[in-house]
Amino acid sequence: HVLRRRQRQMCIRDRPHPDHLSTARDLAATAVAAIRDHPERYAVYREQSYTYNDITQYNRNHLLREDPSVDGLKTGYTRVAGYGLVASAKRQGMRLVSVVMGSSSTASRKAETRSLLNYGFRFFETLRPLTPEASLTEARVWKGQSKQVALGVTDEVVLTLPRSTASIDTQVEVDEPLVAPLNLNDVVGRVTLLRDGEIVSEVPLRV
């Protein structure tokens, strides 16, 4: 029940086919949540071995011993799904999560994961175009003690996009007129982020 509720919170809902137990997107979302919400527990996934009752078990994620940037996450195998690996790596402050499913062997899943991570780090970058500390605009307030209010975002906006020399453009739309009373974090518009004229993200504009 707890797991089902947590999955709903992470928007893990319908399955694409009645015979599928999960999807790569579901596994990636679960991995991201584990890394973000439970850092103290996530550290266990980088352990290469564990000894209990005089029995040593070795981590089957062999990339932990071959790539210092890899610090997790979970291997798996079923007859139907084949060999799989959900991995995560961090290089120069950028973290990526990869999901490989349906491999024919442990060697294959390791090679595919390494290739996928290398591709991601080579051709993608993580940008932080908006921070909560920055005021994006000011707007007129009607029927209030203050005539102007500063507007921005409440959470840092983090985007992982294909590498490009193009900058991120910001468009701010305010749902005017703004009439008092206004409360902190009230949504009063939207912020649209664009690269080369294409929308890459939209977030609420807040007081």
Give residue ranges: language-model regions.
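Domain-terminus/edge residues, biased toward the C-terminal soluble/receptor-binding domains
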Residues: 18-207
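Single conserved hydrophobic/aromatic residue that forms the stacking wall/gate
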Residues: 1-12
